[in-house]
Every structure is written in C-alpha cells, then in structure tokens.
C-alpha cells in the first residue's frame, strides 16, 4: 500500500491493521448506490475545515465526492502511537461503531489507511454539542428549562440502552461527547474509549475517561461494569440542571476531587426550578455503590415518562 512506513513501532504494523480493516480498493458506486462504498480513499473526499483534534487525531468536515454527502473525517496518526494499547483502541473504535446502529449514535461509514494514517469516516453532527449549550445558558445566566433537559436526556438514554444491549460500554459519557444536530437530534459519539464486554465478563480495570464523570470504583480501579455509565449519566443530568459538574471546583487537585466523588459530596439541585423526579434520578445514579444504581432500562423509562410529562405541561 502506498505510503506505508518502512519500520513500525513495537506492537503493530500496517499489514496487521490492513488485515483488520480489509484492503483498500477503488470505490464501486454500483455496489452501494445509497451509501459510501466499502473502501474509500482520500481522493474521494473534499476536506473543508478542521473541526476537532485529539492527542493523536484530527477531525475534519469533508464532502464525499461519490454522493456529495457531508461527513466527518477522523485522521488518526496510528503509527506514531508508541503504545500498542492506543493503536488497539483505534481499531476497537471501528469495531464498536460497526456493531451499533441507532439514530442517536454517530454512525460509522467507512475506514481506510492512507498516508500512514488511519482514516475513519463518520456521520457529521454539525450543530455543536451539549457542553456548548450548557456554556451558552451559563453565559446568559439562565437555567435550561426542564422540558429541554428531558428532551435531550431521553435521547441520550436511548443511545446508551442500545449500547448496553450490545454489551458495549461507553466509558466517557460527558457533555462534550453528546453532539446535537441542527434539528435537535442527539448523537452520542467518541467511542474510542468504549470497551466491548463478552457475555462472560462485565468487569474491567483500566483507568480511562474524564475525572469529573468517573465513578468511585473507576478511580480506584477496583473493577467496574455498565453501572459506571449510569454514574456518568447522573453527572450529566446534574450538569444540565446546575450548569456545572456536581464535583466541579477541584480540577487542579485530583486528590480532593477523588474525595468528593467517593463521598458523593455535591451541592443539591435547586428544588424550586427542577422536579423531585429529576433530583431523585440524579441521586440514584450518583450513588457510591454501583450495585445500588439503577440500570439503563430504568433510567430510560424515567426519562421517557418525564419527557412526556414536561412536554405536555
């Protein structure tokens, strides 16, 4: 394949990844008339602008020249990642996205290796994310109406329920990973830290994710399961109501932050602005013992009921 490096960091090779992803070959529009072809190349895209970046990746808004659809093109410098685990996470992200098919989850479209980079083609959600909406309301010194909170939260719960039903845990649910389309549809993205669990085990021990949203069992690497996503959902629901994380204030002091998380020490939500049901659900999700947190089916059911109730009042 053109552009492959002559030597590789320990733990991976282009040939190994090409075996995982499949060989690149010219697109065949007749084979997939309504979608991107199975293997694209950079020549099939007109890149417009950079819209995001990570430690080893950059995300661009691009147009697919095959069908003129606007997409997100994530370019990952996979061969510059010195640690094999980071490379495995990128391949894992592709595997997770392939399994998931839900209107509230960013859709995987294609992937290919070119110019020593792994290119992942994703559905574009171009109207911003939940963190931007929270910042906007905070700047305006306004609270988000409860009906709006449930409108978005119920969609997020639907996405997480789909993931959990496929034995996939997100592991980094936070406002910045909850994208919103121009028509108000939630799209949960950034599955790079997600972990696929077999039916035999639901425990993992690696410390990943965003500290403000990490549950006590995750911080201490004592083993955790899908209930850690429930903790993060509770933190996100709280932040939509309070306009800040429940454990905000100790970003520069990890020890103090961990203490707050262990003790579930966070300010109460204003009872005069939000329903008892919302505050109750937050406290159920942000609970120190994962065995006593509700599952995603329960959280989603409450969200659906509250969405219907607040929409009709």
UniProtKB/Swiss-Prot annotation:
Catalytic activity: L-seryl-[protein] + ATP = O-phospho-L-seryl-[protein] + ADP + H(+); L-threonyl-[protein] + ATP = O-phospho-L-threonyl-[protein] + ADP + H(+)
Span of domain Protein kinase: 45-310
Catalytic-site annotation from UniProt: 172
Keyword Nucleotide-binding attributed: yes
Posttranslational mods: Autophosphorylated. Phosphorylation at Ser-206 is required for its activation. Phosphorylated upon IR or UV-induced DNA damage. Phosphorylated by CHEK1 and CHEK2. Interaction with APBB1 down-regulates phosphorylation at Thr-210.
Region Interaction with ARHGAP33, ANKRA2, CDC42, PRDX3, RAD26L, RBBP6, RPS7 and TRIP4, residue ranges: 1-44
Cofactors demanded by this protein: Mg(2+)
Function, in words: Protein kinase which plays an important role in mitotic cell cycle progression. Required for chromosome segregation at metaphase-anaphase transition, robust mitotic spindle formation and cytokinesis. Phosphorylates ATF4, CIR1, PTN, RAD26L, RBBP6, RPS7, TRIP4, STAT3 and histones H1 and H3. Phosphorylates KIF11 to promote mitotic spindle formation. Involved in G2/M phase cell cycle arrest induced by DNA damage. Inhibition of activity results in apoptosis. May contribute to tumorigenesis by suppressing p53/TP53-induced cancer cell senescence. Phosphorylates RPS6KB1.
Similarity comment text for this entry: Belongs to the protein kinase superfamily. NEK Ser/Thr protein kinase family. NIMA subfamily.
PANTHER family: MITOGEN-ACTIVATED PROTEIN KINASE KINASE KINASE 20-RELATED
Subunit structure: Interacts with NEK9, predominantly in mitosis. Interacts with KIF11 (via C-terminus). Interacts with APBB1 (via WW domain). Interacts with ANKRA2, ATF4, ARHGAP33, CDC42, CIR1, PRAM1, PTN, PRDX3, PIN1, RAD26L, RBBP6, RPS7, STAT3 and TRIP4. Interacts with RPS6KB1.
Name the UniProt record assigns to this protein: Serine/threonine-protein kinase Nek6
Organism from which the protein derives: Rattus norvegicus (Rat)
């Amino acid at each position: 394949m053109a552009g492959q490096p002559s030597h590789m960091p320990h733990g991976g090779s282009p040939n190994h990844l090409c075996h995982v992803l499949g060989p690149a070959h010219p697109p065949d529009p007749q084979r997939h008339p309504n979608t991107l072809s199975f293997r694209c190349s950079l020549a099939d895209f007109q890149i417009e602008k950079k819209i995001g970046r990570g430690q080893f990746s950059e995300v661009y808004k691009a147009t697919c020249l095959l069908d003129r659809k606007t997409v997100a093109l994530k370019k990952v410098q996979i061969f510059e990642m010195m640690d094999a685990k980071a490379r495995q996470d990128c391949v894992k992200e592709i595997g997770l996205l392939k399994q998931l098919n839900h209107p509230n989850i960013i859709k995987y479209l294609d992937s290919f290796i070119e110019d020593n980079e792994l290119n992942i083609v994703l559905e574009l959600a171009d109207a911003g994310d939940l963190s931007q909406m929270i910042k906007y309301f905070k700047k305006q010194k306004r609270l988000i109406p409860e009906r709006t909170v449930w409108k978005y939260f119920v969609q997020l719960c639907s996405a997480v329920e789909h993931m959990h039903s496929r034995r996939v845990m997100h592991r980094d649910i936070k406002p910045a990973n909850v994208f919103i389309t121009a028509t108000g549809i939630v799209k949960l993205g950034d599955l790079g830290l997600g972990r696929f669990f077999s039916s035999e085990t639901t425990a993992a021990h690696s410390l990943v994710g965003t500290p403000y949203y990490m549950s006590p069992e995750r911080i201490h690497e004592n083993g955790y399961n899908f209930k850690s996503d429930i903790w993060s959902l509770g933190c996100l629901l709280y932040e939509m109501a309070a306009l800040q994380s429940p454990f905000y204030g100790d970003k520069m002091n990890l020890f103090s932050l961990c203490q707050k998380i262990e003790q579930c020490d966070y300010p109460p939500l204003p009872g005069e602005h939000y329903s008892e049901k919302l505050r109750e659900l937050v406290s159920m999700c942000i609970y120190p013992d994962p065995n006593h947190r509700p599952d995603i089916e329960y959280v989603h059911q409450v969200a659906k009921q509250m969405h219907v109730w607040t929409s009709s009042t």
